[in-house]
């Protein structure tokens, strides 16, 4: 059995190996940027799927020879390849739009510690050197701050894997003149938080935004005596229970928020589905130009009126033009319940002749159509060896 000194020696060696791994990843990233510049210069696509497959196959075979699990090597290098693609996309976007990536300001539903704050921080970290944060009290205030030229970008949650599309955002998108210029997916870990450790049956009131209550409904139903208190955001809920300082109060919020507000985590991962992801969109006053070399989405809303089969015709146009629909949802039109407004994500670049032709055809059979934006797709399809 190894002695304590042996254990410390082994751990020290592992620490050195981990340090070398990080340094090699940093060196790899520099080479990736050189490759991206070469691709831009020679007008080459960001991804080379065949090369990625060959690379991953060689690495998994090398892993086998060194007694490493194939799944482990696959997952590790899928993540490394994904980071390489995102790095190249960022550089290409800067080239296409001549953007200053040093500083940007973001508005989000606050206060700090909300999931919108987390999304804004992660997007800013990926794309800018410095971020100025503006926490807002409502989604409308988030939009207005950008419309009024107070901040550069608005961050809004648009759909959740547990609770679906957020209708309040649908209403905002119909009215605003801003454009969707990006998206980011955030893993949501709803936690039950309190001022101090407390037994669940002693909790009297739980505070949070309506969405977490909906996403954690299975857990909440187990405690019918809890009084549900709705707040503007999860972070607002955390601030409230700190302010009230009542030990029988609790909040649904993020683990990051618990650290910001000094709360105790009673339970983690309370969502109805284990994989709970919220998709956020970024909006700006100006649309962005997206290279044809980048996987892209175009988002639009339209109203077919009361014409029978009009939606089917729209979908048929997409099918005939071999365009992939990534999302379709609808909402009844206020004061006219017999009509619906449709929201659709199409895997295509707005500037392509095929997409322009498609929009022209759709425009002829719809009552209303609005392009919300064209932007890089957040999801990088992983390579399977």
Swiss-Prot record:
Residues 1-92 form the Chorismate mutase domain. Residues 286-385 are annotated as: Regulatory. GO terms for molecular function: chorismate mutase activity; prephenate dehydratase activity. Pathway: Amino-acid biosynthesis; L-phenylalanine biosynthesis; phenylpyruvate from prephenate: step 1/1; Metabolic intermediate biosynthesis; prephenate biosynthesis; prephenate from chorismate: step 1/1. Its EC number is 5.4.99.5, 4.2.1.51. GO terms for cellular component: cytoplasm. InterPro entries: ACT-like_dom_sf, ACT_dom, Chor_mutase/pphenate_deHydtase, Chorismate_II_sf, CM_dom_sf, CM_II_prokaryot, CM_P_1, Preph_deHydtase. It comes from the Bacteria. Residues 105-285 form the Prephenate dehydratase domain. It catalyses: chorismate = prephenate; prephenate + H(+) = 3-phenylpyruvate + CO2 + H2O. This is Bifunctional chorismate mutase/prephenate dehydratase. It comes from Buchnera aphidicola subsp. Schizaphis graminum (strain Sg). The gene is pheA.
